């Protein structure tokens, strides 16, 4: 388990099981093998000396939780680098909230592709950029390039947050689903490239 909210969820499950007659001593051995859901506060470990976290977070509440987790794992003088966008056709009211949280709590932000549906993705990102007061976010439309840029920016002890897509292997476009390699694969590829360049 990693983030505090994962622990709270697990404790809720234990409480429900206990309330339904399962003894705590019977439940505990199963906790040793609990696996995190892909895309839910998923740590990417590929030999790098900085943290990479993939999470589905797309609401102000979930951003608050994942930024709290990032603050707990980032080195004392480390940076938090966030890559995210917002889905089209449904996230209008969430855009200011997620942008403001990132503006207040990140050290660098790259606004990038999400699920545009029938909206113009660049228009969504340009709107989101207007909510930033402290930071000047970069806009890199191509999500793979945005993740590459975040990895290039990261130093030892930093934390990269890849938010909004989780384990999705597609983008929702006007025409339907378009294949995407996933944030996990994009991050691992970017890390492998960065490590190879150091050799």
Positions of the model-derived regions?
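ATP-dependent carboxylate-amine ligase
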Residues: 3, 12-199
């Amino acid at each position: 388990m990693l983030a505090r909210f994962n622990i709270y969820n697990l404790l809720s499950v234990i409480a429900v099981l206990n309330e339904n007659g399962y003894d705590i001593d019977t439940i505990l051995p199963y906790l040793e093998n609990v696996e995190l859901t892909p895309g839910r506060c998923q740590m990417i470990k590929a030999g790098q000396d900085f943290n990479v976290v993939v999470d589905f977070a797309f609401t102000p509440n979930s951003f608050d939780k994942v930024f709290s987790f990032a603050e707990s794992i980032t080195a004392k003088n480390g940076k938090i680098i966030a890559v995210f966008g917002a889905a089209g056709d449904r996230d209008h009211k969430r855009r200011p909230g997620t942008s403001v949280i990132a503006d207040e709590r990140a050290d660098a932000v790259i606004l990038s592709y999400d699920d545009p549906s029938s909206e113009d993705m660049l228009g969504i990102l340009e709107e989101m950029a207007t909510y930033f007061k402290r930071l000047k976010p970069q806009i890199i439309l191509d999500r793979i390039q945005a993740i590459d840029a975040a990895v290039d920016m990261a130093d030892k002890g930093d934390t990269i947050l890849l938010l909004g897509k989780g384990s999705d292997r597609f983008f929702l476009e006007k025409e339907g689903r378009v294949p995407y390699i996933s944030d996990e694969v994009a991050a691992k590829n970017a890390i492998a490239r960065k490590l190879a360049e150091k050799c």
